[in-house]
């Protein structure tokens, strides 16, 4: 592919009010360095946990770090799809998105190193077939498909898989688990800081995915059916992953965690995404570009979690 023009040189310059560039600016303003997080006390807290508690936390971290690595590897075709559309703002944001995913991989690995975990961790995924289906099959297949087919429908399928299911349900539920483990017991302060930093980054990622689906649904109502169909395919798989994880620990899950609580939490996050996408139907596409409701939805989720967890800790 040769280049015939540069978007940053066009009349009027870049639209700094567009959501992708708002997210890009937000990421620059909130930059953080993994090496600045102090994991010293985490090692001491780790040694005090029971064997089952360490097993659960290791499995949870394993799922996170493998997921961050997967997206670091798989997100590039979405950048190419944005280039094919001539959407420089989205391409700029996705370069930051990919960098943040690599940084998340780094910081989870640093935490594992800090608490003394150095063995091969693949076995923690072997008992979770739903995880392997999502991260080793569904995710790479739908993202890599964009290399050959960058169509709006293919973009919606890819965004649903990653931004709405992996991040919008599973990662949020994982953060919820870390909060229940760490905040309510006042342990693992480094992990608490790690989750806070990553959660802030991924709210922007989810907002971009919602924005992308909304603009395609606004442009062509057939893409609403694509969104709805893909969500309905993957929500049961995401919930099955939660059930598989709890099934490994019998009637007494570590940290007194509740399977029903987690299933309800994850389902709520998934179902509420339908409304945000559906209200883009019939809207002017240009209006969607400067509509910040995707970011506001993620901030709402974060505020709700803060209030819920603060009440539980009181």
UniProtKB/Swiss-Prot annotation:
Chain residues that bind Fe cation: 101, 167, 202, 205
Gene Ontology CC annotation, any one: cytosol
Amino-acid positions noted as binding Mn(2+) in the UniProt annotation, renumbered to this chain: 68, 101, 104
Pfam families, per the entry: Ribonuc_red_sm
EC number of the protein: 1.-.-.-
Domain of life of the source: Bacteria
GO molecular function: identical protein binding; iron ion binding; manganese ion binding; oxidoreductase activity
Record location of the 3-(O4'-tyrosyl)-valine (Val-Tyr) cross-link: 71-162
Keyword terms: Iron, Lipoprotein, Manganese, Metal-binding, Oxidoreductase
Cofactor(s) it depends on: Fe cation; Mn(2+)
Enzyme class, spelled out: oxidoreductase
Disruption phenotype: Deletion of the gene does not have a major impact on sensitivity to frontline tuberculosis drugs such as rifampicin, isoniazid or ethambutol, and does not affect susceptibility to hydrogen peroxide. The deletion mutant survives equally well under nutrient starvation or in hypoxia and is not attenuated for growth in macrophages.
GO biological process: deoxyribonucleotide biosynthetic process
Transmembrane intervals: none
Binding note for cofactor: Binds 1 Fe cation per subunit. Binds 1 manganese ion per subunit. The iron and manganese ions form a dinuclear manganese-iron cluster.
Protein function: Probable oxidase that might be involved in lipid metabolism. Is not essential for the survival of M.tuberculosis in stress conditions.
Domain notes: The C-terminal segment can alternate between an ordered and disordered state. Ordering of the C-terminal helix shields a large positively charged patch on the protein surface, potentially used for interaction with other cellular components.
Oligomeric form and interacting partners: Homodimer.
The family this protein is said to belong to: Belongs to the ribonucleoside diphosphate reductase small chain family. R2-like ligand binding oxidase subfamily.
Name of the protein described by the UniProt record: R2-like ligand binding oxidase
